[in-house]
Protein backbone atom coordinates (compact mmCIF):
# COMPACT_ATOMS: atom_id res chain seq x y z
CA UNK A 1 0.00 0.00 0.00
CA UNK A 2 1.28 3.47 -0.95
CA UNK A 3 0.46 6.31 1.41
CA UNK A 4 0.29 9.64 -0.43
CA UNK A 5 0.56 12.88 1.54
CA UNK A 6 -1.11 16.01 0.14
CA UNK A 7 -0.75 19.47 1.73
CA UNK A 8 -3.36 22.19 1.30
CA UNK A 9 -0.61 24.69 2.13
CA UNK A 10 1.09 23.75 -1.15
CA UNK A 11 -0.73 24.64 -4.38
CA UNK A 12 1.33 22.21 -6.45
CA UNK A 13 0.52 19.41 -4.02
CA UNK A 14 -3.23 19.97 -4.32
CA UNK A 15 -2.94 20.32 -8.10
CA UNK A 16 -1.16 16.96 -8.35
CA UNK A 17 -3.90 15.49 -6.15
CA UNK A 18 -6.54 16.90 -8.50
CA UNK A 19 -4.80 15.26 -11.46
CA UNK A 20 -4.52 11.99 -9.54
CA UNK A 21 -8.28 11.99 -9.02
CA UNK A 22 -8.71 12.51 -12.78
CA UNK A 23 -6.80 9.32 -13.61
CA UNK A 24 -7.84 7.09 -10.70
CA UNK A 25 -11.13 6.30 -8.96
CA UNK A 26 -10.92 7.09 -5.24
CA UNK A 27 -13.34 6.22 -2.47
CA UNK A 28 -13.66 8.76 0.31
CA UNK A 29 -13.06 6.94 3.61
CA UNK A 30 -12.86 9.95 5.93
CA UNK A 31 -12.99 13.76 6.00
CA UNK A 32 -9.50 14.02 4.46
CA UNK A 33 -8.85 10.41 3.56
CA UNK A 34 -9.27 8.59 0.25
CA UNK A 35 -8.53 5.11 -1.03
CA UNK A 36 -8.06 3.40 -4.39
CA UNK A 37 -6.58 0.05 -5.27
CA UNK A 38 -3.18 -0.08 -3.55
CA UNK A 39 -3.23 3.64 -2.69
CA UNK A 40 -4.38 5.66 0.31
CA UNK A 41 -4.31 9.47 0.33
CA UNK A 42 -4.33 11.77 3.34
CA UNK A 43 -4.83 15.51 2.90
CA UNK A 44 -3.25 17.73 5.58
CA UNK A 45 -3.71 21.42 6.31
CA UNK A 46 -0.10 21.99 7.35
CA UNK A 47 2.96 22.05 5.13
CA UNK A 48 4.28 18.55 4.62
CA UNK A 49 7.84 19.36 5.71
CA UNK A 50 6.57 19.71 9.28
CA UNK A 51 4.35 16.59 9.40
CA UNK A 52 5.90 13.99 11.69
CA UNK A 53 4.97 10.29 11.73
CA UNK A 54 2.80 10.63 8.62
CA UNK A 55 2.55 6.85 8.24
CA UNK A 56 0.43 6.70 11.40
CA UNK A 57 -2.25 8.88 9.78
CA UNK A 58 -3.26 6.19 7.28
CA UNK A 59 -5.91 3.59 8.06
CA UNK A 60 -4.00 0.85 6.27
CA UNK A 61 -0.44 -0.17 7.00
CA UNK A 62 1.57 1.55 4.27
CA UNK A 63 4.76 0.19 2.72
CA UNK A 64 5.98 3.69 1.95
CA UNK A 65 4.93 7.31 2.12
CA UNK A 66 5.08 9.52 -0.99
CA UNK A 67 4.74 13.26 -0.50
CA UNK A 68 3.59 15.18 -3.58
CA UNK A 69 5.00 18.67 -3.41
CA UNK A 70 6.12 21.80 -5.19
CA UNK A 71 9.75 22.42 -6.02
CA UNK A 72 11.06 25.98 -5.82
CA UNK A 73 14.18 27.19 -7.58
CA UNK A 74 15.75 28.84 -10.61
CA UNK A 75 15.77 25.58 -12.52
CA UNK A 76 12.97 26.03 -15.03
CA UNK A 77 10.34 23.33 -15.53
CA UNK A 78 11.54 20.38 -13.46
CA UNK A 79 10.15 17.11 -12.14
CA UNK A 80 12.21 15.72 -9.29
CA UNK A 81 12.29 13.24 -6.43
CA UNK A 82 14.36 13.17 -3.25
CA UNK A 83 14.60 11.93 0.30
CA UNK A 84 14.43 14.04 3.42
CA UNK A 85 16.92 14.72 6.16
CA UNK A 86 19.21 17.28 7.75
CA UNK A 87 22.99 17.11 7.91
CA UNK A 88 23.17 20.07 10.27
CA UNK A 89 20.56 22.14 12.05
CA UNK A 90 16.94 21.45 11.10
CA UNK A 91 15.74 24.73 9.58
CA UNK A 92 12.83 23.33 7.56
CA UNK A 93 11.33 20.50 9.58
CA UNK A 94 12.66 17.28 11.00
CA UNK A 95 15.41 16.80 13.56
CA UNK A 96 19.01 18.00 13.56
CA UNK A 97 21.52 15.63 11.93
CA UNK A 98 18.92 13.03 11.06
CA UNK A 99 17.70 11.35 7.87
CA UNK A 100 14.39 9.64 7.14
CA UNK A 101 14.13 6.04 5.94
CA UNK A 102 14.56 6.04 2.15
CA UNK A 103 12.92 3.90 -0.55
CA UNK A 104 15.62 3.53 -3.24
CA UNK A 105 13.90 0.90 -5.37
CA UNK A 106 10.66 2.89 -5.54
CA UNK A 107 12.61 6.11 -6.08
CA UNK A 108 14.36 4.58 -9.10
CA UNK A 109 10.97 3.55 -10.46
CA UNK A 110 9.38 6.96 -9.96
CA UNK A 111 12.30 8.79 -11.61
CA UNK A 112 12.05 6.41 -14.58
CA UNK A 113 8.31 7.14 -14.79
CA UNK A 114 8.83 10.89 -14.50
CA UNK A 115 11.23 10.66 -17.42
CA UNK A 116 8.62 8.76 -19.44
CA UNK A 117 5.72 11.09 -18.64
CA UNK A 118 7.48 14.47 -18.49
CA UNK A 119 6.22 17.06 -21.00
CA UNK A 120 8.95 18.01 -23.50
CA UNK A 121 9.83 21.27 -21.76
CA UNK A 122 10.49 19.58 -18.39
CA UNK A 123 13.80 18.25 -17.12
CA UNK A 124 13.91 15.33 -14.67
CA UNK A 125 16.41 15.03 -11.83
CA UNK A 126 17.14 13.56 -8.46
CA UNK A 127 17.78 16.12 -5.76
CA UNK A 128 20.02 15.67 -2.77
CA UNK A 129 18.60 14.86 0.66
CA UNK A 130 17.23 17.99 2.33
CA UNK A 131 14.62 19.42 4.73
CA UNK A 132 12.15 17.53 6.93
CA UNK A 133 10.41 15.49 8.02
CA UNK A 134 12.87 12.95 9.41
CA UNK A 135 10.39 10.89 11.44
CA UNK A 136 7.91 9.41 8.97
CA UNK A 137 7.23 5.89 10.18
CA UNK A 138 7.88 4.24 6.81
CA UNK A 139 10.30 4.58 3.89
CA UNK A 140 9.47 7.85 2.16
CA UNK A 141 10.30 10.39 -0.52
CA UNK A 142 9.10 13.67 -1.97
CA UNK A 143 8.03 13.73 -5.63
CA UNK A 144 7.93 17.31 -6.86
CA UNK A 145 6.62 19.65 -9.55
CA UNK A 146 8.70 22.75 -10.19
CA UNK A 147 10.05 25.20 -10.25
CA UNK A 148 7.76 28.29 -10.22
CA UNK A 149 4.05 29.16 -9.79
CA UNK A 150 3.55 28.68 -13.54
CA UNK A 151 4.58 25.02 -13.31
CA UNK A 152 2.77 24.44 -10.00
CA UNK A 153 -0.50 25.09 -11.85
CA UNK A 154 0.49 23.33 -15.07
CA UNK A 155 -1.93 20.48 -15.78
CA UNK A 156 0.54 18.52 -17.91
CA UNK A 157 3.32 18.68 -15.33
CA UNK A 158 0.98 17.80 -12.46
CA UNK A 159 -0.48 14.91 -14.42
CA UNK A 160 3.02 13.56 -15.12
CA UNK A 161 3.75 13.50 -11.39
CA UNK A 162 0.35 11.93 -10.65
CA UNK A 163 0.91 9.16 -13.20
CA UNK A 164 4.43 8.45 -11.94
CA UNK A 165 3.21 8.16 -8.34
CA UNK A 166 0.29 5.95 -9.34
CA UNK A 167 2.73 3.62 -11.12
CA UNK A 168 4.36 2.85 -7.75
CA UNK A 169 1.59 0.41 -6.88
CA UNK A 170 3.19 -2.95 -6.24
CA UNK A 171 6.75 -1.57 -6.33
CA UNK A 172 8.67 -2.50 -3.15
CA UNK A 173 10.59 0.28 -1.39
CA UNK A 174 13.85 -1.70 -1.41
CA UNK A 175 15.61 -4.05 -3.80
CA UNK A 176 18.81 -6.05 -3.48
CA UNK A 177 21.17 -3.11 -3.92
CA UNK A 178 21.53 0.63 -3.45
CA UNK A 179 24.33 3.16 -3.46
CA UNK A 180 24.58 6.37 -1.45
CA UNK A 181 26.33 9.44 -2.84
CA UNK A 182 28.54 12.01 -1.14
CA UNK A 183 29.42 15.31 -2.81
CA UNK A 184 28.33 17.05 -5.96
CA UNK A 185 25.63 19.60 -6.65
CA UNK A 186 22.14 19.90 -5.24
CA UNK A 187 20.62 18.36 -8.36
CA UNK A 188 23.03 15.41 -8.23
CA UNK A 189 23.97 14.93 -11.89
CA UNK A 190 25.97 11.81 -11.03
CA UNK A 191 23.05 10.18 -9.21
CA UNK A 192 20.67 11.20 -11.99
CA UNK A 193 23.00 9.59 -14.58
CA UNK A 194 23.20 6.38 -12.58
CA UNK A 195 19.42 6.18 -12.36
CA UNK A 196 19.08 6.78 -16.10
CA UNK A 197 21.81 4.38 -17.20
CA UNK A 198 21.87 1.49 -14.70
CA UNK A 199 19.67 -0.68 -12.51
CA UNK A 200 21.32 0.73 -9.36
CA UNK A 201 18.90 2.57 -7.07
CA UNK A 202 20.34 5.59 -5.29
CA UNK A 203 19.77 6.14 -1.60
CA UNK A 204 20.52 9.26 0.41
CA UNK A 205 22.67 11.94 -1.24
CA UNK A 206 24.78 14.44 0.69
CA UNK A 207 25.66 17.29 -1.68
CA UNK A 208 28.67 19.56 -1.24
CA UNK A 209 26.64 22.02 0.81
CA UNK A 210 25.27 19.16 2.92
CA UNK A 211 28.79 18.01 3.77
CA UNK A 212 29.69 21.56 4.76
CA UNK A 213 26.76 21.50 7.19
CA UNK A 214 27.81 18.08 8.44
CA UNK A 215 31.33 19.17 9.37
CA UNK A 216 34.05 16.64 10.19
CA UNK A 217 32.76 13.22 9.07
CA UNK A 218 34.55 11.37 11.85
CA UNK A 219 32.91 13.62 14.43
CA UNK A 220 29.47 12.81 13.02
CA UNK A 221 29.87 9.13 12.19
CA UNK A 222 26.30 8.46 13.26
CA UNK A 223 24.92 10.64 10.46
CA UNK A 224 27.19 9.01 7.89
CA UNK A 225 26.15 5.56 9.11
CA UNK A 226 22.47 6.55 9.05
CA UNK A 227 22.70 7.40 5.34
CA UNK A 228 23.53 3.75 4.67
CA UNK A 229 21.14 2.12 7.12
CA UNK A 230 18.24 4.36 6.08
CA UNK A 231 18.95 3.50 2.43
CA UNK A 232 19.55 -0.23 2.83
CA UNK A 233 22.91 0.37 1.15
CA UNK A 234 26.44 -0.91 1.60
CA UNK A 235 28.19 0.97 -1.25
CA UNK A 236 29.08 4.63 -1.62
CA UNK A 237 30.19 6.99 -4.36
CA UNK A 238 32.37 9.84 -3.11
CA UNK A 239 32.73 12.88 -5.36
CA UNK A 240 36.20 14.44 -5.27
CA UNK A 241 39.10 13.86 -2.90
CA UNK A 242 37.66 13.43 0.61
CA UNK A 243 40.11 11.21 2.53
CA UNK A 244 38.55 11.66 5.97
CA UNK A 245 35.07 10.88 4.67
CA UNK A 246 36.33 7.86 2.73
CA UNK A 247 38.16 6.56 5.78
CA UNK A 248 35.07 7.06 7.96
CA UNK A 249 32.88 5.17 5.49
CA UNK A 250 35.30 2.25 5.40
CA UNK A 251 35.73 2.25 9.17
CA UNK A 252 31.95 1.92 9.45
CA UNK A 253 32.13 -1.23 7.31
CA UNK A 254 30.92 0.06 3.96
CA UNK A 255 32.57 0.00 0.54
CA UNK A 256 33.58 3.05 -1.50
CA UNK A 257 33.25 2.35 -5.22
CA UNK A 258 33.78 4.26 -8.46
CA UNK A 259 31.12 5.25 -10.95
CA UNK A 260 32.81 2.84 -13.36
CA UNK A 261 32.22 0.04 -10.86
CA UNK A 262 28.55 0.96 -10.54
CA UNK A 263 28.11 1.07 -14.31
CA UNK A 264 29.98 -2.16 -14.96
CA UNK A 265 28.00 -4.09 -12.33
CA UNK A 266 24.68 -3.02 -13.83
CA UNK A 267 22.46 -6.09 -13.96
CA UNK A 268 25.08 -8.44 -12.48
CA UNK A 269 24.26 -10.14 -9.16
CA UNK A 270 26.56 -8.75 -6.50
CA UNK A 271 27.58 -12.21 -5.31
CA UNK A 272 28.77 -12.91 -8.87
CA UNK A 273 30.61 -9.58 -8.97
CA UNK A 274 32.47 -10.42 -5.76
CA UNK A 275 33.41 -13.92 -6.95
CA UNK A 276 34.71 -12.75 -10.33
CA UNK A 277 36.65 -9.84 -8.86
CA UNK A 278 38.24 -12.32 -6.48
CA UNK A 279 39.07 -14.80 -9.25
CA UNK A 280 40.33 -12.34 -11.88
CA UNK A 281 40.92 -8.72 -10.92
CA UNK A 282 38.91 -5.71 -9.83
CA UNK A 283 36.69 -3.57 -12.02
CA UNK A 284 38.90 -0.57 -11.33
CA UNK A 285 41.88 -2.60 -12.59
CA UNK A 286 40.13 -3.53 -15.84
CA UNK A 287 37.60 -6.29 -15.17
CA UNK A 288 34.58 -6.07 -17.47
CA UNK A 289 31.50 -8.27 -17.24
CA UNK A 290 30.04 -10.17 -20.16
CA UNK A 291 26.45 -10.79 -21.17
CA UNK A 292 26.18 -14.22 -19.47
CA UNK A 293 27.08 -12.73 -16.07
CA UNK A 294 23.57 -11.40 -15.55
CA UNK A 295 21.87 -14.80 -15.69
CA UNK A 296 24.48 -17.57 -15.30
CA UNK A 297 24.13 -19.44 -12.01
CA UNK A 298 26.65 -22.28 -12.23
CA UNK A 299 30.40 -22.52 -11.92
CA UNK A 300 32.97 -21.18 -14.34
CA UNK A 301 36.43 -21.72 -15.79
CA UNK A 302 39.19 -19.12 -15.52
CA UNK A 303 41.05 -19.30 -18.83
CA UNK A 304 44.25 -17.72 -20.10
CA UNK A 305 43.45 -15.69 -23.23
CA UNK A 306 45.49 -16.33 -26.41
CA UNK A 307 47.41 -13.06 -26.52
CA UNK A 308 49.01 -13.49 -29.97
CA UNK A 309 45.65 -14.08 -31.63
CA UNK A 310 44.07 -11.22 -29.72
CA UNK A 311 46.84 -8.83 -30.80
CA UNK A 312 46.11 -9.68 -34.44
CA UNK A 313 42.35 -9.41 -33.95
CA UNK A 314 42.64 -6.07 -32.15
CA UNK A 315 44.63 -4.77 -35.13
CA UNK A 316 41.71 -5.71 -37.38
CA UNK A 317 38.79 -4.53 -35.23
CA UNK A 318 39.29 -3.74 -31.56
CA UNK A 319 35.62 -3.22 -30.77
CA UNK A 320 34.56 -6.52 -32.38
CA UNK A 321 37.30 -8.37 -30.52
CA UNK A 322 36.20 -7.02 -27.16
CA UNK A 323 32.58 -7.74 -28.08
CA UNK A 324 33.52 -11.37 -28.75
CA UNK A 325 34.84 -11.65 -25.22
CA UNK A 326 31.89 -9.94 -23.59
CA UNK A 327 29.39 -11.99 -25.62
CA UNK A 328 30.63 -15.34 -24.32
CA UNK A 329 32.55 -14.76 -21.08
CA UNK A 330 31.18 -14.01 -17.65
CA UNK A 331 34.00 -11.51 -17.29
CA UNK A 332 37.19 -10.52 -19.10
CA UNK A 333 40.30 -8.68 -18.02
CA UNK A 334 41.08 -5.63 -20.13
CA UNK A 335 43.52 -2.77 -20.56
CA UNK A 336 43.14 0.72 -22.02
CA UNK A 337 39.97 1.47 -20.05
CA UNK A 338 38.22 -1.66 -21.25
CA UNK A 339 39.12 -1.22 -24.92
CA UNK A 340 41.45 -4.25 -25.31
CA UNK A 341 41.26 -7.81 -24.01
CA UNK A 342 44.36 -8.97 -22.17
CA UNK A 343 45.22 -11.64 -19.65
CA UNK A 344 42.40 -13.97 -18.69
CA UNK A 345 38.65 -14.44 -18.62
CA UNK A 346 35.99 -16.49 -16.87
CA UNK A 347 33.78 -18.63 -19.11
CA UNK A 348 30.68 -20.59 -18.10
CA UNK A 349 32.14 -23.72 -19.73
CA UNK A 350 34.46 -24.97 -22.45
CA UNK A 351 31.81 -24.51 -25.15
CA UNK A 352 31.59 -20.80 -24.35
CA UNK A 353 35.36 -20.49 -24.72
CA UNK A 354 35.25 -22.28 -28.09
CA UNK A 355 32.49 -19.94 -29.27
CA UNK A 356 34.65 -16.98 -28.24
CA UNK A 357 37.61 -18.28 -30.28
CA UNK A 358 35.29 -18.80 -33.25
CA UNK A 359 34.17 -15.17 -33.02
CA UNK A 360 37.76 -13.95 -32.83
CA UNK A 361 38.56 -16.05 -35.90
CA UNK A 362 35.64 -14.36 -37.66
CA UNK A 363 37.18 -10.98 -36.84
CA UNK A 364 40.44 -12.11 -38.46
CA UNK A 365 38.55 -13.34 -41.53
CA UNK A 366 37.74 -9.74 -42.41
CA UNK A 367 41.39 -9.05 -43.34
CA UNK A 368 43.14 -12.44 -43.57
CA UNK A 369 42.85 -14.58 -46.69
CA UNK A 370 42.84 -17.81 -44.74
CA UNK A 371 41.90 -18.57 -41.13
CA UNK A 372 41.85 -22.14 -39.87
CA UNK A 373 41.76 -24.06 -36.59
CA UNK A 374 43.18 -27.53 -36.03
CA UNK A 375 44.45 -29.44 -33.00
CA UNK A 376 44.14 -26.44 -30.69
CA UNK A 377 46.03 -24.11 -33.02
CA UNK A 378 44.76 -21.18 -35.06
CA UNK A 379 46.54 -20.16 -38.25
CA UNK A 380 45.77 -16.99 -40.19
CA UNK A 381 47.60 -15.86 -43.34
CA UNK A 382 47.46 -12.85 -45.62
CA UNK A 383 49.56 -11.01 -48.15
CA UNK A 384 50.88 -7.70 -46.83
CA UNK A 385 52.94 -4.84 -48.21
CA UNK A 386 56.67 -5.44 -47.69
CA UNK A 387 58.49 -2.10 -47.36
CA UNK A 388 61.88 -3.81 -47.59
CA UNK A 389 60.95 -5.33 -50.96
CA UNK A 390 59.85 -1.91 -52.21
CA UNK A 391 63.10 -0.36 -51.05
CA UNK A 392 65.07 -3.15 -52.76
CA UNK A 393 63.38 -2.17 -56.03
CA UNK A 394 64.57 1.39 -55.53
CA UNK A 395 61.22 2.96 -54.60
CA UNK A 396 61.99 5.90 -52.30
CA UNK A 397 59.72 6.91 -49.43
CA UNK A 398 57.18 9.42 -50.61
CA UNK A 399 53.88 9.58 -52.52
CA UNK A 400 54.72 6.71 -54.88
CA UNK A 401 55.79 4.52 -51.96
CA UNK A 402 52.47 5.29 -50.25
CA UNK A 403 50.42 4.44 -53.35
CA UNK A 404 52.24 1.15 -53.69
CA UNK A 405 51.59 0.36 -50.02
CA UNK A 406 47.93 1.10 -50.65
CA UNK A 407 47.72 -1.55 -53.39
CA UNK A 408 48.19 0.70 -56.44
CA UNK A 409 50.68 -0.08 -59.23
CA UNK A 410 53.24 2.67 -59.86
CA UNK A 411 55.69 3.71 -62.58
CA UNK A 412 59.29 3.92 -61.38
CA UNK A 413 62.45 4.30 -63.47
CA UNK A 414 60.52 3.48 -66.61
CA UNK A 415 58.92 0.31 -65.36
CA UNK A 416 55.66 -0.69 -63.76
CA UNK A 417 55.84 -2.08 -60.24
CA UNK A 418 52.74 -4.03 -59.29
CA UNK A 419 51.66 -4.45 -55.65
CA UNK A 420 52.25 -8.22 -55.93
CA UNK A 421 55.95 -7.53 -56.44
CA UNK A 422 56.29 -5.96 -53.01
CA UNK A 423 54.19 -8.27 -50.85
CA UNK A 424 55.05 -11.03 -48.44
CA UNK A 425 53.01 -13.61 -46.60
CA UNK A 426 52.18 -12.76 -43.01
CA UNK A 427 51.24 -15.68 -40.79
CA UNK A 428 49.73 -15.65 -37.34
CA UNK A 429 49.99 -19.02 -35.68
CA UNK A 430 49.03 -19.45 -32.05
CA UNK A 431 47.85 -21.91 -29.47
CA UNK A 432 44.13 -21.38 -28.81
CA UNK A 433 43.49 -24.53 -26.80
CA UNK A 434 41.69 -23.99 -23.51
CA UNK A 435 44.21 -23.47 -20.72
CA UNK A 436 42.47 -23.23 -17.38
CA UNK A 437 44.26 -20.99 -14.92
CA UNK A 438 44.36 -21.80 -11.21
CA UNK A 439 42.21 -19.29 -9.36
CA UNK A 440 44.14 -16.82 -7.27
CA UNK A 441 42.47 -14.62 -4.74
CA UNK A 442 42.59 -10.97 -5.78
CA UNK A 443 42.70 -8.52 -2.91
CA UNK A 444 39.90 -5.97 -3.05
CA UNK A 445 39.62 -2.80 -0.94
CA UNK A 446 36.59 -4.30 0.80
CA UNK A 447 38.70 -7.18 2.17
CA UNK A 448 40.06 -5.03 4.96
CA UNK A 449 38.01 -1.90 4.71
CA UNK A 450 34.39 -2.70 3.95
CA UNK A 451 31.72 -5.21 3.25
CA UNK A 452 29.72 -6.26 0.21
CA UNK A 453 26.04 -5.54 -0.30
From Swiss-Prot:
Cofactor remark: Binds 2 Zn(2+) ions per subunit.
Region (Disordered): 428-453
One GO BP: D-amino acid catabolic process
Keywords, ordered alphabetically: Hydrolase, Metal-binding, Zinc
EC number: 3.1.1.96
Subunit structure, interactors included: Monomer.
Similarity comment: family membership: Belongs to the DtdA deacylase family.
Protein name per UniProt: D-aminoacyl-tRNA deacylase
Organism: Halobacterium salinarum (strain ATCC 700922 / JCM 11081 / NRC-1)
Amino acid sequence: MIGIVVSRADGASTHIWAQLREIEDFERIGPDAYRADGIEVRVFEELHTTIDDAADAFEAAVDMVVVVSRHSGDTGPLLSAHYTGNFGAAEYGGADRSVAPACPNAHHAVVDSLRSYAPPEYDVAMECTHHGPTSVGAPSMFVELGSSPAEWQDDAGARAVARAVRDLRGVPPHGDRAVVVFGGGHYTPRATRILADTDWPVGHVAADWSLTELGRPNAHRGVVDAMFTASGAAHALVEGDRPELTETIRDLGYTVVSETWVRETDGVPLSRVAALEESLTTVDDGLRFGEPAATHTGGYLVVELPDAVLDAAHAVDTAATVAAGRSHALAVTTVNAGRRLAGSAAFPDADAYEAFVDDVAAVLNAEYASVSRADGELTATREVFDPEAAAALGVPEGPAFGRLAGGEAIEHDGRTIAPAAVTSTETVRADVALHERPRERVRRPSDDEGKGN
